[in-house]
């Protein structure tokens, strides 16, 4: 109950910020980037951290046993519907947080298909290359350069004073949830994983601004944020099956 109350209070504070930010005097570029990297993004993803016990639906265990299915997908679909409703009502703030909730739930549902930690490691090693290709040569590049409205729909926003915003693609949010959930499921270091992924995202934003590029792939930073804080544990877990044989 304490965690749920904290989540609702934080959500209310974020909604209040998103409402007020456009009416506050604008910041310089670097002040805006630092605000996003070290305040807005961590605080927004703190919602995911507070909701983390829901990754395996244990809080709804009796319902799950009766209905014989997980509730991640139905709940995620409900949030998608809410996001569409808020969008139709021209209330992007509501749509923004519904997208964050929906993709987080889908990420935790996706995690249930990973039967071994090695699968998670493999994904963490592969997706940075896929994301890099997509951002620099593939569909993400085409969407961000020629279809800004599509990217807006398929991303979450972090609003700064003056009304400007940085955006993070929904696949990035999904894998943030996957790796955070995996750190709990496989007995790794959830807190350090959470902090590591936030550092990876923050550095990605700072480097993109410093190098004056339109955008950098976010998944390399997220993957490293998962792999590096857990490197010794991951190595031990991978060696254990070999030693048993």
Where are these predicted regions, by residue range?
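A membrane-topology feature that recognizes alpha-helical transmembrane segments
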Residues: 1-245
């Amino acid at each position: 109950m304490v965690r749920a109350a904290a989540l609702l209070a934080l959500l209310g504070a974020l909604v209040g910020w998103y409402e007020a930010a456009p009416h506050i005097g604008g910041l310089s570029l670097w002040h805006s980037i630092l605000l996003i990297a070290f305040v807005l993004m961590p605080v927004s993803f703190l919602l995911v951290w507070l909701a983390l016990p829901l990754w395996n639906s244990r809080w709804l265990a009796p319902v799950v046993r009766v209905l014989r299915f997980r509730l991640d997908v139905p709940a995620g679909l409900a949030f998608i519907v809410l996001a569409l409703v808020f969008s139709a009502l021209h209330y992007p703030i509501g749509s923004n947080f519904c997208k964050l909730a929906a993709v987080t739930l889908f990420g935790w549902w996706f995690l249930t298909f990973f039967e071994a930690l090695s699968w998670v490691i493999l994904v963490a090693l592969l997706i940075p290359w896929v994301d890099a290709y997509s951002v620099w040569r593939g569909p993400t590049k085409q969407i961000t350069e020629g279809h800004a409205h599509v990217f807006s729909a398929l991303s979450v926003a972090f609003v700064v004073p003056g009304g400007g915003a940085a955006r993070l693609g929904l696949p990035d949010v999904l894998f943030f949830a996957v790796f955070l959930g995996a750190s709990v499921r496989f007995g790794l270091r959830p807190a350090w994983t959470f902090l590591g992924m936030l550092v990876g995202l923050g550095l990605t934003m700072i480097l993109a601004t410093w190098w004056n590029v339109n955008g950098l792939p976010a998944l390399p930073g997220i993957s490293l944020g998962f792999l590096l804080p857990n490197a010794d544990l991951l190595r031990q877990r991978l060696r254990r099956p070999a030693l048993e044989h």
